[in-house]
Amino acid sequence: MANVGFVGLGVMGSRMVKRLLDAGHKVTGYNRTKSKAQWLVDAGMKWSETPRAAAQAADVTFTMVTNTAALEAVANGSDGILAGLAAGKLYIDMSTVSPAASRELAAKVAAKGAKMLDAPVSGSVSTLEEGKL
């Protein structure tokens, strides 16, 4: 099983992490508000203090945040995902962001020698919990 990093543990992201844990994956997660993710830590997720540390611990890192500004906040800077990516790693963004923001981020990921997949999702919590997203 791959080591997974997950940044953005809101309504949808938290349910995705729960399904990954249930499938036996090792998940290191980060959320701006740690208390909202405590139930995932209790379920076996390892807590990360920064998005960078989540990416460093992972073979594949996911983001599921609300908008372009939120994505830029977790991706950039000395504690951002980009600082934790290394050559050969995979980054998958499932956030709702502009195509221009995705292209800009993909260029930064490529400069690190990593790969990026832009994979926005739509659906409901029940669809996700049923594994049909």
For each predicted feature, which ranges?
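Rossmann-fold dinucleotide-binding core
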Residues: 4, 65, 91, 97-133
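Short, well-ordered alpha-helices that flank and scaffold nucleotide-derived cofactor binding pockets
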Residues: 18, 22, 76, 107
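Short gly/ser/thr-rich secondary-structure transition/capping motifs
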Residues: 42-48, 72-76, 115-119
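Short, conserved loop/helix-junction motifs that constitute active-site signature segments
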Residues: 81-86
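NAD(P)+-binding Rossmann beta1-loop-alpha1 motif at the extreme N-terminus of oxidoreductases
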Residues: 1-63, 89, 94, 125-128
